[in-house]
A protein has these predicted regions:
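Glycine-rich phosphate/pyrophosphate-binding beta-alpha loops
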Residues: 56, 60, 113-128, 192
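Catalytic core of DAGKc-family lipid kinases
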Residues: 1-110
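Short, flexible, solvent-exposed loop/turn segments with mixed acidic/basic and small polar residues
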Residues: 41-43, 126-131, 190
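ATP/nucleoside-binding phosphotransfer catalytic cores, i.e., glycine-rich phosphate-binding loops
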Residues: 99-106, 131-132, 141-238
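Gly/Ser/Thr-rich active-site loops/lids in small-molecule metabolic enzymes
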Residues: 71-79, 120-122, 128-149
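Short acidic/glycine-rich loop or secondary-structure boundary segments that cap or lie
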Residues: 60-63, 105-108, 120-123, 147-151
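Short beta-strand-to-turn element immediately C-terminal to the catalytic PLP-Schiff-base lysine
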Residues: 37-38, 56, 66, 114-115, ...
Length: 238
């Protein structure tokens, strides 16, 4: 995708195609979690999908669904900032959130996100505790009321502060069910997935095998950029 978030969270050299090919054929294997999610739509349909990074409903989905394609072609992931600014103002919505079969809790939110990993574009750690292989979902509820609340969220995220703020609530669980008092737009891994009235997400531990840089591969420097090592030529057919 535009942000290449899964590759970023896996520390792959995203700007070097040759090195990525080398990793694909000769790297080391790692098992990571995926997330199975069921959406209930306005017409009562239930659809099932799988994602690897972040899914959600509300403000984040507004951004993904309203980012201009031509701007993404020009500016890449920075295009999301323009849509984000346009959608900053908006009302909060009532939702209920239940974790691991527990008692549903009510929130007034701008967005609810379910994450498998936490790094965004630009190296921003939205959920520093989120890990791709911990068998847990990271649930984030954002409930800002005005610009000052958004500023608090931005400062906490950028500075990676461990202090809690009332408008940014996070928890971990293996399963999360969210019901919306009114239909809300949704997204999975940056793709708009329509308006929904409920979601039910479950972690699928160790369900996907990915290839990573081999531990003894000296062709990748600490900054994630590959050194000038050629891709091996295929053996000639005899």
């Amino acid at each position: 995708g535009t942000g290449n978030l899964l590759a970023r969270n896996l520390d792959l050299p995203i700007n070097d195609v040759e090195q990525c090919l080398r990793i694909a054929v000769g790297g080391r294997q790692r098992r990571i979690d995926t997330v199975d999610v069921r959406f209930t739509h306005e017409d009562g349909r239930v659809t099932r999908q799988t994602f690897t990074v972040i899914g959600g409903a509300g403000y984040d989905a507004d951004i993904m669904g309203d980012t201009k394609d031509e701007l993404k072609d020009l500016a890449g992931w920075l295009a999301y900032s323009e849509a984000g600014i346009r959608h900053l103002r908006g009302k909060r919505h009532e939702v209920t959130v239940a974790l691991d079969g527990g008692q549903p809790r009510r929130f007034k939110v701008r967005t609810v996100m379910v994450a498998n990993c936490g790094m965004l574009t630009g190296g921003v750690e939205l959920l520093p505790q989120a890990k791709l292989d911990d068998g847990l979902l990271d649930v984030m509820v954002l409930s800002p009321r005005h610009a000052l609340d958004w500023a608090r969220i931005a400062v906490k995220t950028v500075t990676r502060s461990r202090s809690s703020i009332p408008v940014m609530h996070t928890e971990q669980a293996q399963r999360v069910k969210v019901e919306f008092a009114e239909p809300m737009p949704s997204q999975l891994d940056g793709d708009a997935t329509g308006v929904i009235t409920a979601l039910d997400a479950r972690v699928q531990p160790d369900s996907l095998v990915v290839m990573l840089v081999a531990e003894d591969d000296a062709s990748v420097r600490d900054d994630g950029v590959s050194a000038a090592a050629p891709v091996p030529e295929p053996a000639p057919h005899i």
